[in-house]
Amino acid sequence: MLKPLGDRVVLKIEEKEEKVGGFVIAGNSHAATKTAAVVAVGQGVRTLTGELVAPSVKAGDKVLVESHAGVEVKDGEETYLLVSEANILAIVE
C-alpha cells in the first residue's frame, strides 16, 4: 500500500465510460475535473514555526480534483493518482 508524504494524497479515480456513435470514450478525457475516492493521506505540512497543519481530507472522502493534476502510480494491479492537497478542489458530500 502507498503511504503518501507531506501534503500528498493518494486517490482512486472513478472512471466513467461514454458512448458516442458506438465508440467508447473515456469519461474523463474532456472534463476539467475528475471525481475520486481518497485512499490515503499524508501527515500534512509544517509551517515556518514548525506547527503541523493536518490535511483537510481523510481516507474514504469523495473529492473533486483537477483533471491534469498529479502523477499516476501503480501498486500491484491497481492504478492510483498521487496529488498535492492543493489540487483537490472540493469534498463531494
From Swiss-Prot:
Q: Name one GO molecular function term.
A: protein-folding chaperone binding
State the Gene Ontology BP annotations.
Answer: chaperone cofactor-dependent protein refolding
Q: List the gene name.
A: groES
- Source species of the chain: Streptococcus gordonii
**SUPFAM superfamilies found in the cross-reference section:** GroES-like
Q: Where are the transmembrane segments?
A: none
Query: What do the Gene Ontology cellular component annotations say?
Result: cytoplasm
On assembly, the entry states: Heptamer of 7 subunits arranged in a ring. Interacts with the chaperonin GroEL.
Keywords (alphabetical) are: Chaperone, Cytoplasm
User: Pfam families in the record, alphabetically?
Assistant: Cpn10 (PF00166)
Q: Which InterPro entries match?
A: Chaperonin_GroES, Chaperonin_GroES_sf, Chaprnonin_Cpn10_CS, GroES-like_sf
Name the chain's protein.
Co-chaperonin GroES
Family in the record: Belongs to the GroES chaperonin family.
Query: What is this protein's function?
Result: Together with the chaperonin GroEL, plays an essential role in assisting protein folding. The GroEL-GroES system forms a nano-cage that allows encapsulation of the non-native substrate proteins and provides a physical environment optimized to promote and accelerate protein folding. GroES binds to the apical surface of the GroEL ring, thereby capping the opening of the GroEL channel.
List localization entries. Cytoplasm
